[in-house]
Amino acid sequence: MKLNISYPINGTQKCIEIDDEHRVRVFYDKRIGQEVDGESVGDEFKGYVFKIAGGNDKQGFPMKQGVLLPTRVKLLLAKGHSCYRPRRNGERKRKSVRGAIVGPDLAVLALIITKKGEQEIEGITNDTVPKRLGPKRANNIRKFFGLTKEDDVRDYVIRREVTKGDKSYTKAPKIQRLVTPQRLQRKRQQKSLKIKNAQAQREAAAEYAQLLAKRLSERKAEKAEVRKRRASSLKA
């Protein structure tokens, strides 16, 4: 079985193949989300704690969280479900998925290091893979740098260097949800426009109601006149 071990703190991951079945037997009958002591896998993982994140069986079918079986099942999957990506709006499909309980039929098991042990694992804990892009949303930039609402977020945007031919220049993402004076002015303008439109609609509705009442009274008067004429002709 292969163990795909990831360390989110450093942004690294590595696939380690373990031929001895006795070493991976500790994972059997465990579910996705459960934690396992690393020392039972091998002495090189002493002090480590692994969390089971998923895996694939020998035919390539992925494990699905919530399916409490150690076998493969066919489920009707739709948009929002894991292990399925719909191609059309509202499309559903019955697909084979592997249950969330670990068994000997798995080819790859995905693990996350939740607690670091004594020794370094080559290529995982001793390396770091920096993030290529920084945060883009204004609140996330504030959270990333520990800024207050008074600080200007635009000074803290992470720029990246781009080289095109002989020239090199820096590039920064457009900050999303940034509150600027122009945005506040636009918001005020939209609000005043909304109030003006609502007032115009109210006035138009009142004018229409007045006209309708006038037409109804005119029709009523006409009918009364017709009745009066009819009554006078019958008397004559």
Curated annotation (Swiss-Prot):
Recorded GO CC terms: ribonucleoprotein complex; ribosome
UniProt keywords, alphabetically: Phosphoprotein, Ribonucleoprotein, Ribosomal protein
Keyword GTP-binding: no
A Pfam family assignment: Ribosomal_S6e
Any Gene Ontology biological process: translation
Record GO terms (molecular function): structural constituent of ribosome
Post-translational modification: Phosphorylated.
Annotated positions of the Phosphoserine modification: S232, S233
Keyword Ribonucleoprotein part of the UniProt annotation: yes
Family: Belongs to the eukaryotic ribosomal protein eS6 family.
UniProt protein name: Small ribosomal subunit protein eS6
